[in-house]
Amino acid sequence: MTTNTFTDPPVEMAKERGKTQFTVRDVTNFLNGGEEETQIVEKIMSSIERDPVLSVTADYDCNLQQARKQTMERVAALSPYLVTDTEKLSLWRAQLHGMVDMSTRTRLSIHNNLFIGSIRGSGTPEQFKYWVKKGAVAVKQFYGCFAMTELGHGSNLKGLETTATYDQDSDQFIINTPHIGATKWWIGGAAHTSTHCVCFAKLIVHGKDYGTRNFVVPLRNVHDHSLKVGVSIGDIGKKMGRDGVDNGWIQFTNVRIPRQNMLMRYAKVSDTGVVTKPALDQLTYGALIRGRVSMIADSFHVSKRFLTIALRYACVRRQFGTSGDTKETKIIDYPYHQRRLLPLLAYCYAMKMGADEAQKTWIETTDRILALNPNDPAQKNDLEKAVTDTKELFAASAGMKAFTTWGCAKIIDECRQACGGHGYSGYNGFGQGYADWVVQCTWEGDNNVLCLSMGRGLVQSALQILAGKHVGASIQYVGDKSKISQNGQGTPREQLLSPEFLVEAFRTASRNNILRTTDKYQELVKTLNPDQAFEELSQQRFQCARIHTRQHLISSFYARIATAKDDIKPHLLKLANLFALWSIEEDTGIFLRENILTPGDIDLINSLVDELCVAVRDQVIGLTDAFGLSDFFINAPIGSYDGNVYEKYFAKVNQQNPATNPRPPYYESTLKPFLFREEEDDEICDLDE
C-alpha cells in the first residue's frame, strides 16, 4: 500500500536532510559543550535505550496504577547510578531520560536533588556523612522526599505552619501539624515510597518563632514500611499528568526527632536552646535554586524533542496547494507555518544558552558558599558577597525558571497544533508531554509569583547600584551609562541585524524599565511600607522580570556564538537574530515607549523576521538533527528520523490496539441494549407534513 499518491515521505526527508549546509556534529558539540561531552551524552543515551526496563514505547496506554509500578521499576533500574555517577553524569542522565519519562525523572530528582540536595546544602558536613551512612545516597533501606508545600501555603515559605518545637528536657524537636491547612500536600514520593522527608517547619524555641527551617523526619519503619508513630500519610490520587509520581499528604502529631535532625549548616540550636541564625535566610534555600536551575535545562530538552517532531513532520506533510499544481505543498513551505515554528526553534536554542549560564553560576556560587565558614569573622566580607550573589541567583533563577517553563509549554502546544489532527493522537506524545510538563509552571514556585519576586529583586539591585554597592555580574548593566535613543530617523537594516545593537537595545529597554520602577518605588515608600509599595508596582515588577530575562537569554546566546566553529556561526547567528527580532515583536510597546525603535523600525523588523524564517527553513532538519535524538527519545511516529511517518504511525496504532474483535467489550451490556431499545411512544416523523 502506498502512503500518499503524490509523495514518498522517506525520500522527501532525505532530500530535506541533504539541504543542510553545515556539519551537524559541530552544532551538536556546540550545544553539548564539546566532542567529549557529546560522547558522554551518547553513551548515556545508548545505555538508556538498551535497557528494556526503561523502554517508553508503550507508556501512552498505561493507567494510574500501571504508571506507578512501572515508574518504580525504572527508579530501581536507575538508582545504582546515583552512587556511581559523577555530579555531571547524574545531571545528564536525569535530563536525557526525563525528556521521555518525566515521572521517573521526578521521582529520582525529588530524592537526589531536593532531599539529598537539602542535606548537602543546609546540613553540616557531619550531618551529611551521617545520612550517607544511613543509606540516603545509595537509596538502600532509605528514600527521601521534600515536604515543603502545605494545603494552605505553597510559594510563601514564611507562611508555612507546620511546627518544630524544641523540648530541652529530651533534646528533641516535636513536629506537629496544627490544623488541616498545615497538612503537607503534593509531596512527591510520600504516598508509597519515602521513608524520610526533609520537612519545612517553623522553628519554635522557648516559645519564640525563629522562622522556617529544615528538619529530617522519619516517616516509615525501615523493616516493614509501616508508618512511624504520629505520622499520617495519604495518596492524593489522579493528577493532570505525571501519573507515575506518588504524590501524597503528610500530617504529624507529636512526632519526636533528635535535635541533630535539624539541618544546621546555617541556623543552629544548642542543647540548651540557644538559637544562632544565619546571615541570610536564602542561604538555606539552596535546594530550591538547584531545582529551578534544573527546570531551565529541562525546558530546553523537552522543547527540542517536540520541535523535532513538529519540524520533521512539517517537512514531509503535504496539504493543499496552488491551482494547477500536481503536488500539494509541504506545510513547512507555508510562510505562516514557518512563522509559527521557526522562532520557537530559535527560542529553544536560546534556552540552552541560558540554562548553561544558570548552571555555571549555580555551581560557582554553591562551591564558594560551601567553602566558607559562616562563623569565621575573618570571612565576613566573603560571606557578605556570597549572600549578595545568592540573593541575586535566587531572584534570577526564579525569573528564568518562570519564562523558560512557560516557553516550553507554549512550544509543546504550538507544535501539537502545527501537526494538525495527528498532533492530538496520544501516540505522538504531545498530550502526555503537555500534561506532564505544565506542573513545572507551578511547583517550586508559581511562575507569576516568581516573576514578581524577581522584579522585586531587580529593584533592590538597582537601589544597591544607586548606592554604589556590589551587585552580581548579570545585573551590572543597569548601572551602565550607554543607551540607545532614536532621533526619529529610524534604524538601518544592517543595524537591526547587528548583535551589538540588539543586545544594547534589550539592555536599554530593561535598564529603563527597572530604573523607572525603582523611581516609582522610592516615591511610594515615602508614604507606604516597602511591602505595600512593591504590591502597588506588581505589573511593573512583572514587566521588569520579563524584559530582563529576555535580554539575558539574548546576551547569553550571542556571547556563546563567539565560541562556535566558523562553519556554524552564520547559522547560529541567524537563529539568534531571529530570536531577538521576534522577541521585539512580542514586546513592541516597550521599545516604542522607550524611544529605542520607531514604528517604521517595527515594520522593518516584521519583514526581517519573515526573511530569517525563509533563511532558516532549509536548515531545520540539520538544526533538529543536531539535538542528537534517536527515535527512542522522540517516541512519536510522526517525528521519526527517516520520515516514514504514515506507515510507522499506522503500525503504532495497530500495535497498541490490535483489531481482534470488531465488537467492544461492552457490546452486550451497553451498546446492544442501546441500539435495540424499544420506545413506548415511538412515532415516525413525517417530514412531508
Swiss-Prot record:
What SUPFAM superfamilies does the database record attribute to this sequence? Answer: Acyl-CoA dehydrogenase C-terminal domain-like, Acyl-CoA dehydrogenase NM domain-like
Report the EC number(s), separated by commas if there are several: 1.3.3.6
**Which residues hold FAD?**
T149, G188
Its required cofactor(s), as named, are: FAD
BP GO annotations:
fatty acid beta-oxidation using acyl-CoA oxidase
Entries under Pfam families matching the protein: ACOX, ACOX_C_alpha1, Acyl-CoA_dh_M, Acyl-CoA_ox_N
Localization (cell)? Peroxisome
Q: What class of enzyme is it?
A: oxidoreductase
Q: Tell me the subunit arrangement.
A: Heteropentamer composed of five different subunits.
- The name this protein carries in UniProt is Acyl-coenzyme A oxidase 1
The record lists the organism as Yarrowia lipolytica (strain CLIB 122 / E 150) (Yeast)
Q: What's the encoding gene here?
A: POX1
